[in-house]
């Protein structure tokens, strides 16, 4: 009986049709991957991407030069220099982040009392030279201006958990 069954299965190509059916089931199923450069997956409001310095609605920068972010940074990637202004407040004259040292832990964002330094939604910031990964105050403010709407929305969504 075994030989007859084996001959019958071989003649009807049962193994082939079984494998073909399995392949067709996955061929028409929903794709599990994305076509990355053209499609992007959803990001969490807590996503930690490229750093940015924010401004108030009137255009004044938020950073009060408290240097908490510099003190808490475990990688020592942040360098801040400040000087007093005529009204007695402090403002930064230099705010640099060495992105080659940064470990994207988010401590700088958590330590900031005025939400001046944030990690934005951008994760595509490859560079050809090492110098391009040293962000100065102008570059950080530019990032903040570019993504302010998304950053504000993400901070609002994350507010209940802070």
Curated annotation (Swiss-Prot):
Annotated positions binding [4Fe-4S] cluster 1: 63, 66, 69, 112
One cellular-component annotation, GO: plasma membrane
Cofactor, free-text remark: Binds 2 [4Fe-4S] clusters per subunit.
Catalytic activity: a quinone + NADH + 5 H(+)(in) = a quinol + NAD(+) + 4 H(+)(out)
Binding residues for [4Fe-4S] cluster 2: 73, 102, 105, 108
Cofactors that this protein relies on: [4Fe-4S] cluster
Bilayer disposition of the protein: Peripheral membrane protein
A GO MF label: iron ion binding
InterPro entries xrefs: 4Fe4S_Fe-S-bd (IPR017896), 4Fe4S_Fe_S_CS (IPR017900), NADH_quinone_OxRdtase_chainI (IPR010226)
Disulphide-bridged cysteine pairs: none
Cell compartment(s), UniProt: Cell inner membrane
Pfam family for this entry, one: Fer4_7
UniProt GO BP: aerobic respiration
UniProt keyword annotations, A-Z: 4Fe-4S, Cell inner membrane, Cell membrane, Iron, Iron-sulfur, Membrane, Metal-binding, NAD, Quinone, Repeat, Translocase, Ubiquinone
Assembly mode: NDH-1 is composed of 14 different subunits. Subunits NuoA, H, J, K, L, M, N constitute the membrane sector of the complex.
Family matches, as NCBIfam families: NuoI, PRK05888.1-4, PRK05888.1-5
Functional summary from the UniProt entry: NDH-1 shuttles electrons from NADH, via FMN and iron-sulfur (Fe-S) centers, to quinones in the respiratory chain. The immediate electron acceptor for the enzyme in this species is believed to be ubiquinone. Couples the redox reaction to proton translocation (for every two electrons transferred, four hydrogen ions are translocated across the cytoplasmic membrane), and thus conserves the redox energy in a proton gradient.
Protein name (Swiss-Prot/TrEMBL): NADH-quinone oxidoreductase subunit I
Gene: nuoI
